[in-house]
Amino acid sequence: MRKRTGKKWNTGLALLLCLAGLSGCQNASGLPETSETEQEERIQIGITFDSFIIERWQRDRDVFVSAAQELGAEVNVQNANGDMEEQIAQMDYFIQKEMDVIVVVMVASDEDESGLIEAVGRAQKAGIPVVAYDRLILNADVDLYISFDNVQVGRLMAEHMQEHLGEGGELLQVCGPMADYNVPQVMEGFEEVLGNSNLKIMETEYAEEWLAETGFTATGAYLKTHYEVDGVMCGNDSIAGHAVRALSECRMAGKVCVVGQDADLDACQRIVEGTQCMTVYKPVEKLARRAAANVSIVSLV
């Protein structure tokens, strides 16, 4: 364990990386100058992920670790496997190891978040800044928040549906869990665009803990009562894949406009096949690299 040198942490800093421009970030060349002693002491970053079931998080992990190492930092990666208590334990482990900064991809579940909020407070009390990566920890005074413009993601989904279903139609929404702060933001952008269209949201379902199979069960249940649907808005491409599976069982795949986000490889293949209309590509590589650079800055402030 390393002895702390009385650094003052810059609390209350908030940063939003948008799809358009990823502005407001300082690059690696803008890192504060450090003494030879500090340069010899590599920055220790602890990062805890919700899980790696969703393909996108694997990409974030790999790029973040690579970028941080290029900047001279060491990264300890932990996987909470969708368990809030496990994520809290991982944060306490990072505190015990006296990490320079802790990065959290919050577990998106209906579990009480008070324990996670308290863990953020314990880290900051120990002089360790906490960064919320792509999922804001509500009611926690994190030092840095890094994400995309999720409202714009919703707008892009709706705009494509509007173009594809110009004469109007009935839609099913299968969103992620409301426990994920990004979900209501995406819905806000989606519904904002639909307010000026002939498209109508008939039903909204939520995939708790981002359970992708909800796409199959929700779409199948909807078709049993409504018999047809013109479009399915899915919270991500994993959910979209299962929605397409349900449509296939009803011989409707390719006839219904299905949209998602993350640009997973399977989604791109479905687009080529014609069973998924579009996916919102979010430059996670750019986000992860900018995050690594800014996390390094926060650790030196």
Model-derived regions: residue spans:
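Sec-dependent N-terminal signal peptides of Gram-positive bacterial secreted proteins and lipoproteins
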Residues: K8-A28
